[in-house]
Design a protein with these regions (language model features):
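Conserved HGGG/HGGXW glycine-rich cap/lid loop of the alpha/beta-hydrolase fold
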Residues: 19-65
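Flexible "cap/lid" subdomain of the alpha/beta-hydrolase fold that forms the substrate-access gate
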Residues: 2, 14-16, 35, 41, ...
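Glycine-rich phosphate-binding loop signature in dinucleotide/nucleotide-binding domains
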Residues: 23-24, 91-95, 288
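Catalytic active-site module of serine/aspartate enzymes centered on a nucleophile-bearing elbow/loop
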Residues: 256-294
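Short acidic/polar mixed-charge low-complexity motifs
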Residues: 12-14, 25-26
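An N-terminal hydrophobic leader/cap segment in hydrolases
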Residues: 1-7
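Conserved beta-strand termini and adjacent loop/short-helix elements that scaffold enzyme active sites
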Residues: 21, 235, 262-265
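Conserved beta-strand positions that form and line the central face of beta-propeller blades
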Residues: 7, 17, 28, 211
Length: 294
């Protein structure tokens, strides 16, 4: 696939590695990757979308080829939202776009999808396995009061979040992950042995831990009421071993124009079932265009 690459400077002087794919005259999709991935994780999905869309991807700070901030607070959600703004202002200035995000890419993209300044520019948001931390905090409080089994079920899926708060633990563990070792972990989760390898996995895992440390405790202890400023689609992965599908149940409270689609897949469906994920992205975007045209 033909692609071009760019360097974009952020508001705090970090450098983000950005790629664009396809015909610039097509509608724009911005894809944001999760943890411990980099933008290459989207390439299987891009292959099914590039004929119809102009696609923008980037390595989030601390991942792939992008620079690595020295302090944890540089990974806070407001700054990550500014990173997205820097990317779109540089690569697609003054153009509107559809946002699609997975895992931590989705968590950080909720910050933008609930930010009023994007109202005239962000056309839609497709979230995959990454809830808004503020919404999740309200949901967990409600579950603890009224549905404790559901609360503890999600806690068992989120054990790693507590582990990532321990200084030096996660960065040390990631040093032992080779691309092949991580590939075997993904293969067991997704039931496929032909998944592409992440050759940056040790660094991506080590540095990306700061996403958890900078955001989970502040957001879970002091959640904010944040409402979506555009139509939202949640692609719910029914076999997801890290994010409970029940977290999506409350999402209509926060998104006036909301739809949900279930996919029988595990957490990294963008790798194991890229055609299915691409189909749902395309369907949602096309439906938006039909509604807008009418």
């Amino acid at each position: 696939m033909e692609q071009q690459s760019y360097w974009v400077q952020t508001t705090d002087q970090q450098r983000l590695y950005v790629k664009t794919w396809g015909n610039a005259n097509n509608p724009v999709l911005v894809l944001v990757h999760g943890y411990p991935d980099n933008q290459e994780v989207w390439e299987p999905v891009i292959g099914h979308l590039v004929q119809d869309y102009y696609i923008v991807t980037y390595d989030v700070r601390g991942a792939g080829m992008s620079s690595v901030p020295r302090c944890t607070r540089a990974y806070a959600l407001p700054q990550l939202s500014l990173d997205l703004e820097s990317v779109v202002n540089s690569v697609i200035p003054q153009r509107s776009f559809h946002l699609v995000a997975h895992d931590w890419g989705s968590i950080q993209s909720w910050e933008s999808a609930t930010e009023p300044k994007y109202r005239e520019r962000m056309l839609s948001f497709t979230t995959i396995s990454g809830p808004c931390l503020d919404h999740a905090a309200f949901w967990m409080r409600e579950q603890f009061k009224q549905h404790k089994p559901q609360f503890f079920k999600q806690l068992t899926k989120s054990w790693y979040i507590a582990a990532f708060q321990v200084p030096f633990l996660a960065p040390t563990v990631w040093q032992f992950f080779s691309p092949e070792h991580w590939g075997k972990v993904l293969s067991r989760l997704e039931g496929r042995s032909d998944l592409p390898l992440n050759h940056h996995i040790a660094a991506d895992g080590k540095h990306g831990v700061a996403l958890y440390r900078a955001n989970f405790i502040p957001r879970l202890t002091k959640p904010r009421e944040r409402f979506a400023i555009c139509p939202v689609q949640a692609i719910v992965l029914e076999q997801d071993q890290f994010v409970s599908p029940a977290l999506i149940d409350e999402m209509p409270k926060w998104a006036e124009d909301f739809q949900r689609v279930n996919v029988n897949a595990n957490h990294w469906a963008i790798l194991s079932q890229p055609e299915v994920i691409a189909k749902e992205i395309k369907r949602f975007v096309q439906n938006w265009r039909c509604v807008e045209a009418s």
